[in-house]
């Protein structure tokens, strides 16, 4: 899951969308475009937006979050001290000391979004409506539309329409 402002765009979530998946993600990359198509009610966004990320970068101290958030501390300590005999010190140290993707900063928002996703899933009518809204909104990502846009906007080509068989 990318930090807002760090992902150019990806197609994986578009493939999921066209099959009815509901996106749970940051407002970054293709998620911005998906959000524009399906609206606030049919995508689950968490975390900071680009402006908030930029404002936070200069004074961000992930260790402050580690020290003040018991859930974050427990998760990182589990990485540090091991899971089933495996230690993940490099990941734990990166999160505590630099956290370049500001995962700790977005953590509380992610937890709330995950809880909301679970609530939505329990209401099957709501979940199905969200799913159908994603399928219906996915047409903008079709290859036909993309090729037509490239042909017109980049290559300056006119759209070819074949004559009717009756002509």
Language-model segments: what does each one mean?
Residues 160-167:
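Conserved small/polar residues in nucleotide/adenosyl-binding loops
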Residues 1-131, 135-140, 145, 149-152, ...:
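Catalytic binding pocket for nucleotide-activated donors in carbohydrate/polymer assembly enzymes
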């Amino acid at each position: 899951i990318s930090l807002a402002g760090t992902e150019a765009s990806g197609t994986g979530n578009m493939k999921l969308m066209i099959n009815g998946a509901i996106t749970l993600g940051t407002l970054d990359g293709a998620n911005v475009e998906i959000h524009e198509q399906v609206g606030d009610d049919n995508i689950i966004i968490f975390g900071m937006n680009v402006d908030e990320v930029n404002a936070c970068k200069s004074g961000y101290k992930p260790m402050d979050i580690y020290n003040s958030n018991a859930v974050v501390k427990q998760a990182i300590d589990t990485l540090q001290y091991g899971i089933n005999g495996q230690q993940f010190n490099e990941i734990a140290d990166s999160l505590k000391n630099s956290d370049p993707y500001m995962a700790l900063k977005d953590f509380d928002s992610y937890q709330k979004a995950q809880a909301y996703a679970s609530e939505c899933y329990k209401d099957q009518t709501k979940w199905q409506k969200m799913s159908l809204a994603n399928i219906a909104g996915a047409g903008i990502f079709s290859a036909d539309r993309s090729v037509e846009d490239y042909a017109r906007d980049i290559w300056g080509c006119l759209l070819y329409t074949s004559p009717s068989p009756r002509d």
